[in-house]
């Protein structure tokens, strides 16, 4: 059996944030959610999160994950003290305990699997994850004997000059035989500079300690401040871009674009500079996004272009052109072959196939049929100060420039609205609707007496 414990009790003082450190966002998910996801493929029998600082907030954020046990560490007195809180929780448990850190979010699933499998194959009491760092300053050094066993872990400040030349470091991630660990946990001492209980000290107490070296040291980067958060974001973003480039997506300027891990792309998608995708985006084949666009929880069909525009929680069909400077807001549903042009905003509306809203319009709480042509400056006046009302426009209708449709109102099929009209009443199929003051021209106005 396998139990996973994630250490998530720390304050994260150096983040200088009201948000607990483990809830800081990284490419669309919190740090601790990424850590939990990295171990999901192991299908652990128990998953425990050791919480402390703002425990209620952490539990509330993660409650939806399910099958997650929360263990309170109060006060927070070191990593060894955190794992001691599992003694009553895992009473009678037989198997391995995998200990992960809630602020180390770049671990790959295959690295964790390698650690657990290596531990099981070696029959060790503990197997720790190690990394060779170009600059190991500040890290504890791991020393290994000829048989591959860990002979010692020496903190940086205690290393001799010769020992400092060793760049094999302790990543602080462990796989234990739980029964062996449970015997030594009560023996931990606070006899150290910080007066805390260190989980690292258990390694020297256990008869057989082994290690597995991580291939990519970036995987064990911890996060203690905003700079390190940004560095990890950069690493993760590069991973995501590399993955999708291998799947047939073109990034014109990769470093200027950001993705969420929940994005999915078809083939031959081109992403122009300064384009950002957040949340769960689904992008079809042959789309061109950007430059300078933001998509969030958006679903696009194939052959869609988005130029200098924002698409949030909207659905877009095939062959649609969006922008420049358009804004599709939540619940906008744009059918195949539409054109959503310059400075157009669409909110909570359905736009039928082949319809065009080319310039300077607001379409809100509306339903447009197929092949509707919305003239420049057409506005659906949907709000009466208390409630929102719907506008319905039938197939093949067209509105002239600078028209106002005051909802609730329905225009039938093949209706024409004269330019500059304010329409307040329903219009039947095939009709011409004009709602504007009669033009009055007064001759000689410029020459009138002062």
Curated annotation (Swiss-Prot):
Cofactor: Mg(2+)
An MF annotation (GO) of this entry: glucosamine-1-phosphate N-acetyltransferase activity
Residues annotated as binding UDP-N-acetyl-alpha-D-glucosamine: 7-10, 21, 73, 78-79, 140, 155, 170, 224, 329, 347, 362, 373
Gene Ontology cellular component list: carboxysome; cytoplasm; membrane
Positions of region (N-acetyltransferase): 248-450
Active site: 359
Region Pyrophosphorylase, residue ranges: 1-226
Subcellular location: Cytoplasm
InterPro entries: Bifunctional_GlmU, GlmU-like, GlmU_C_LbH, Hexapep, MobA-like_NTP_Trfase, Nucleotide-diphossugar_trans, Trimer_LpxA-like_sf
Residue sites binding Mg(2+) per the record: 103, 224
Transmembrane regions: none
Metabolic or biological pathway, per its Swiss-Prot or TrEMBL entry: Nucleotide-sugar biosynthesis; UDP-N-acetyl-alpha-D-glucosamine biosynthesis; N-acetyl-alpha-D-glucosamine 1-phosphate from alpha-D-glucosamine 6-phosphate (route II): step 2/2; Nucleotide-sugar biosynthesis; UDP-N-acetyl-alpha-D-glucosamine biosynthesis; UDP-N-acetyl-alpha-D-glucosamine from N-acetyl-alpha-D-glucosamine 1-phosphate: step 1/1; Bacterial outer membrane biogenesis; LPS lipid A biosynthesis
Family affiliation: In the N-terminal section; belongs to the N-acetylglucosamine-1-phosphate uridyltransferase family. In the C-terminal section; belongs to the transferase hexapeptide repeat family.
Protein name: Bifunctional protein GlmU
Species assigned in the record: Parasynechococcus marenigrum (strain WH8102)
